[in-house]
Amino acid sequence: MQRDPGTALVLFSGGQDSTTCLAWALENFERVETIGFDYGQRHRIELDVRPYLLERIRTDFPAWRGRLGGDHMIDMAVLGQISDTALTRGVEVALNANGLPNTFVPGRNLLFLGFAAALAYRLSAKHLVIGVAETDRFSYPDCRDDAVKAIQLALNLGMEKRFIIHTPLMHRDKAQTWALADWLGGEALVKLICEGSHTCYSGDREHRHSWGFGCGTCIECNLRAAGWEQFRSCKEAPVTAHEMT
């Protein structure tokens, strides 16, 4: 595979999707840096596992080690202060009247991509990589393809740059996300994502399942578990390089 000689900045939360996207970026770009956001999320454990994941990628994947650069953590406490959601308040996860779960944090990805672009501007990084998808049962408005394209246009107009926002998972479900990780880094990466990444909205690191740690009952745990089972059941099916790009 011929890699882009430029620099990519990956929005890296410490979850399954962003870890997979980090591997994708390391396979596709010569230089990769990461950015994370602390907005007071109730599942803050995802931020705590980030250093472990970055270190393991450096030690376990020699081909990627030299391409993985700096990590940047941004304090976004103000987002948690103005958001009344299940991810920023101690309330039970439920559906809102508009059909979206109350785990939706309005404006989150718009702000994340804006701050990431500001950092990318300083780093002279043209590429932004984010693990959003519109294939989940609940597709958040700021995770949809048309929203991301609109954000890219706004950033380019507002900064007079030519950023490209890459969304490797946009049209992939969770089973296909597991398959992409397997294709990129083999069983070693799949195992690292299982053991090291965190997706559970409850922040549960006590209960270990075949697909990783979590409460096993929240929306994200259910999606991750279902995707894992489908991925393992289809593991023997051949996968082409075209399907993974």
From Swiss-Prot:
GO MF annotation, one: ligase activity, forming carbon-nitrogen bonds
Residue numbers binding ATP: 12-22
Presence of the UniProt keyword ATP-binding in the record: yes
Protein's GO biological process: queuosine biosynthetic process
Annotated residues for binding of Zn(2+): 200, 215, 218, 221
EC numbers, comma separated: 6.3.4.20
Entry keyword set: ATP-binding, Ligase, Metal-binding, Nucleotide-binding, Queuosine biosynthesis, Zinc
InterPro entries for the chain: QueC, Rossmann-like_a/b/a_fold
Pathway(s): Purine metabolism; 7-cyano-7-deazaguanine biosynthesis
Disulfide cross-links: none
The protein's required cofactors: Zn(2+)
Cofactor comment text: Binds 1 zinc ion per subunit.
Domain of life: Bacteria
Top-level EC class: ligase
Function statement: Catalyzes the ATP-dependent conversion of 7-carboxy-7-deazaguanine (CDG) to 7-cyano-7-deazaguanine (preQ(0)).
Protein family membership: Belongs to the QueC family.
Name this protein carries in UniProt: 7-cyano-7-deazaguanine synthase 2
Record organism: Mesorhizobium japonicum (strain LMG 29417 / CECT 9101 / MAFF 303099) (Mesorhizobium loti (strain MAFF 303099))
The gene coding this protein: queC2
